Amino acid sequence: MKKFFFAVAALVLPCVLVSNAFAADREHTLKVYNWADYIDMNVLNGFPAWYYEQTGEQVEVLYQTFDINESMLTEIEIGQEDYDVICPSEYIIERMLRNKLLQPINKNFGNTPDYTKLVSPFAVDKFQQMAPDTNTCVADYTVGYMWGTTGILYNTALVNQEEILSLGGLQNEKFAGKVFMKDAFRDIYSVVVLYAYREEIARGEVSRDELVANVTDERIARVEEFLTNMKNNVAGWEVDFGKEEMTKGKAWLNLSWSGDAQWAIDEAAEVGVNLEYFVPKEGSNVWFDGWCIPIYAKNTKAASYFINYMCMPQNAILNMEEIGYVSVVASPEILEWANDEEVEETSNLTYFFGEGAEAVHANHGFYPDQSGIERCALMHDCGDKTEDMLAMWSRVKGDNLSAGLVVFILIVMAVIVFTIIIRTVNNKRQQKMRQNKKRNRRR
């Protein structure tokens, strides 16, 4: 229990201190809330100087990270946290738009170029699919950051690609205890449902987009059947450690995110392990993360400039090289960066870069070719089917959460609630102090 106490204290105290320290100069503070390990810190640290050059105004960046979309959303939706810039995934952006939790990005940058215009039309079109109604232009509320696919990462010395071109190959008994699966029910559902309805897709009875966007009881049942049938092959459900197991040769296969796959491929090559990644022939999901400004943001001007800054080609390249994921920016500089002569095959990337990208020597893990991307569908919020999806996921995994992990999760939730209460009290205290000062001045 002492360890739990100190862990909770370590989580709570910084939040309380930060709340007090930054309340006084909030006007010149930019609060950025992003995924962990998802930015080049040199790019982040360079923003204040760039912002001063563009506006003549000082700003200090308060950078915080999260590991779960839902925890970030809870802080904003319930706690009314005043983060200025956040980087949610597409289904959370969809939910926040529907619940009116985002405000428009001001793209009037004066003499500063609007770098957000360099975002690929492919990404802009995909984001528009998240609109809650026909009157909403999603590009007014979010600008893409990174994107990718979910696919199969495999060890070429242990697995023949012909065996796993179809997702059904993961059910092969020879892979017993050799497959790692992402512990992400939306991502896995989006891939498996395309396999489960492959015949209906082939007959033209249903599209991939419709299958992924509209969750039904029948579709959940088919996905559950597939996952149950391959349960003996699953070595573990992971969010991060699967890629490391692949680099060590301890796992043969990993249903993985493209960015994690690329990281594993690079790391494994250094120790003589050859890994490759591809999208199953039945299709997969294409996912996006994007920058947004929540409705409780205080420094919306700096937030808008920060989003613009992140779209500068040189910054996009630095971020890609640092984190292993792919930027939505599609400028000539990015195309030049993507063209790798060491890659023998060429890909048609006109869907992303436009004319001039008909035959690019690009890494398939970074940029699927035209035929591959046509087999991918955008992941959406499950809406009122979320609980049914979670119940299915729990059955598939066997409800094997340890008591310690359950306790830890409950403590973390309590910490979040406690922190929200503390910050609310502090905010009210600051507001009351300002009101008292005004009264004193009037006297």
PLM features per residue range, with description:
Residues 4-22, 416-421:
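Sec-dependent N-terminal signal peptides of Gram-positive bacterial secreted proteins and lipoproteins
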Residues 66, 88, 181, 237, ...:
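Short beta-strand and adjacent tight-turn residues that come in two discontinuous sequence segments
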